[in-house]
Amino acid sequence: MTDYPNNIPAKLEIIKASEITPKEVRWLWYPYIPFGKVTLLQGDPGDGKSKLMLSLAALLSKGAPLPFADEDESGEPMTVIYQTTEDDADDTVVPRFNSAGGDGDRLIFIKEDEKSLTFGDDRIREAVEKYHAKLLILDPMSSYIGDTCSMNNANETRAEFNHLIAVAKDTGCTIVITAHMNKAKDTSPLYRTNGSIDIASAARSILAVTRTANKQNPAERYPSEENLRRGSAENRATQ
């Protein structure tokens, strides 16, 4: 879609449904994380959001099957971009990735020494296109949405998300953003997103990582899904 300055009327253009070729959603991890879309991964602090994404990144870097997939669902190794402000790469991120058996040549980081990365930073698109990345992880949302964006303002958050939505759509890259949940209890994960509810609306898929009641295995977690099939949810245990 062409962007026009607000003071210049836009030319009317229409397209008929008959002129649109329907296509199926492609999945990075069925039925949780689609290709070419923005996914929001939520959870309380310490519930394993970063560990989950690094484990998935390690499997993808080798072309190995993801959890709950059939053994014959392996694919080509993928390049993953991982950005985080919560853990250092040298003593936490890379050791975790290595311990999960990942290919270090396929996990890359955009350097933020001179300038912090934000949703609208052109370096994101440049890195995705240059290295043919299939997954970009931004951990956590509050560090990358931008200092000038109020997370409680729907207009501001939607504008920031639109940058990432465009990159995902244009390149086919999956973008996963991690976020801490608010303190509300006994409610849908949709309503535990920190900030404006429009954040949940902007994401195409929403996952919530929660602890299970299995005291014999405290490392067990549930990824709960509320996504392309809005209103439905699925829980499966993972390590």
Spans of model-derived segments:
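Conserved inter-motif catalytic segment of the P-loop NTP-binding fold
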Residues: Y4-P9, E24, L28, P45-D47, ...
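Short gly/ser/thr-rich secondary-structure transition/capping motifs
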Residues: I20-R26, T118, T187-Y191
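Pre-Walker A adenine-sensing motif
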Residues: T21-I33, P67-F68
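Phosphate-binding/switch region of NTP-binding enzymes
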Residues: L40-L41, G46-K51, G75, V80-Q83, ...
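Post-Walker A helix-loop "phosphate-sensing" segment adjacent to the P-loop in P-loop NTPases
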Residues: L59-P77
